[in-house]
């Protein structure tokens, strides 16, 4: 840790620990209604979200409607289709390796379940797969499993962006967010140790303000040297041309910046310290802005 100059945190599922299943059910029920609005059968409402059936580390085979649990040798230990377990013989027939070829699970129709947000996707996709296999719904007969997965993913994602989830959380944060008494002392200790502490979240300012006010209090921004909301990760880490906007904390007003050219003194800028003195809350940007404002040269610092 002695070589680390800056420490960053995400907000959702990091500083803000969401309560399951209450939080997940908001996304699940909201996505169900969106799918029904797209033409999916109303019987989709008969399925309930059950977090105990899903976990991170699974792989979704969107082409076949299957869910896989593999070991470190990429051997499929368990597989299920929709909510039903696939027999051992059939599982080996589909996913077993040959004498010189092992499955890579890197093709586009395989999706890694590596975030808690995706557990809702699993449950909802399994429900649509089950309904399609019943062959009782003409709308689903015209859909492939891959198309259904894309619909599920788009519906859940829209719930996170259009207010279906976050408006409800903002109305009653105690119902959906757990507090951690160790969080504030931890952040303060990092600053006392001379580390720069930053918040980098995909959530927008209004929601971030509500959640952090609940977790920490109205002075929560004092715990951070830099705050970036609406970061659009993972694109934030890839696209160097994303614009950086400064946020006026009191009003939420956005002002465009000249990016790294305004920050770096060697590029004719005013320097990170002077730049942040004008306001340390931003929206968007990319990793180059982050490094420039923190005064670090690489992610390793």
Q: What label would you give each PLM region?
A:
Residues 1-301:
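HAD-like aspartate-dependent phosphatase fold
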């Amino acid at each position: 840790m002695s070589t680390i100059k800056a420490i960053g945190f995400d907000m959702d599922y990091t500083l803000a620990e969401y309560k399951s299943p209450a939080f997940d059910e908001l996304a699940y029920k909201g996505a169900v209604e969106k799918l029904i609005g797209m033409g999916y059968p109303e019987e989709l409402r008969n399925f309930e979200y059950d977090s105990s059936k899903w976990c991170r580390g699974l792989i979704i085979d969107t082409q076949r409607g299957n869910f896989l649990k593999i070991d470190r040798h990429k051997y499929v230990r368990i597989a299920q289709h929709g909510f039903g377990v696939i027999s051992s013989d059939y599982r080996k027939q589909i996913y077993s390796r040959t004498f010189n070829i092992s499955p890579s699970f890197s093709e586009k129709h395989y999706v890694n379940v590596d975030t808690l947000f995706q557990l809702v996707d699993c449950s909802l996709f399994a429900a649509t797969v089950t309904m399609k296999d019943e062959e009782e719904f003409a709308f689903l007969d015209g859909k492939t499993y891959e198309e259904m997965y894309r619909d599920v993913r788009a519906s859940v994602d829209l719930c996170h962006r259009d207010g279906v989830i976050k408006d409800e959380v903002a109305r009653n944060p105690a119902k959906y967010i757990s507090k951690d008494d160790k969080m504030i002392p931890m952040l303060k200790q990092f600053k006392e140790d001379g580390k720069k502490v930053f918040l980098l979240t995909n959530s927008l300012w209004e929601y971030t303000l509500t959640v952090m006010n609940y977790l920490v209090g109205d002075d929560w921004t004092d715990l951070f040297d830099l705050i970036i909301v609406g970061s659009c990760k993972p694109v934030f880490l890839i696209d160097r041309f994303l614009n950086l906007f400064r946020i006026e904390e009191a009003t939420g007003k956005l002002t465009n910046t000249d990016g790294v050219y305004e920050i770096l003194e060697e590029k004719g800028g005013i320097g990170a310290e002077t730049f942040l003195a004008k306001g340390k809350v931003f929206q968007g940007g990319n990793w180059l802005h982050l490094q420039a404002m923190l005064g670090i040269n690489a992610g390793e610092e």
